[in-house]
């Protein structure tokens, strides 16, 4: 359970002070979904910068340069890879065909190890499942709607992720995890967070910095939305059928093959859910019980998010 957050000041209407206030408010509001680590990515001049630490957002001090337009952020609840190894924290740095990008992911991938084997992804000291997405995009050699579609259709588990490239294009890839995007057309600013509740809570403390009406931009499951430096939006889609498919899952690392999702309790996704359960007041035995009753791992994770089983 993590949180994505950020803004895009495509009109250049915000001062440096306002930008720092906005990103701090968004980050602190996002703590409800993770306090183990906090990080942001942004582009200044010709350089893509990433600032991340194994601290809760309220301990972070952001100093954004005045010329920054897009900021992509993440708060983390650790599920795989210690947050004390800062390389495991989001956003991650990648390079596709010589062009840098940053990526932040909310969710749990169940097939990251399988992808590393099948796609022959290089060994890395980064231990998180999320980094497999970075490596797949590096292997694809470009960041665009097509490579994001192909990559997303390879993923299993739960995900929504954001990518900021070297040209200040901000991509939002919505899988089966929540996402909320607001647009202030008069101010020429976009704001986003993983949930509407988090975004509204942040807005309650920064609304004076934003003028005019607000509109919610729909980002549905299977959408790939690109926010461009001039404020325009381009869209693509990918299939999400595989995220709800009950076909057989292969777990080559554990030697288990099953035609029913609830029988893969020895798989990596179920193990991550068991690790996550305690943070929400449940036990690993509860996860086994729900799997035995036919709940999919994705459904259990979503129940964690919304507090209902």
Task: Give residue ranges: language-model regions.
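Conserved short alpha-helical segments that host acidic/polar catalytic motifs at enzyme active sites
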Residues: 1-309
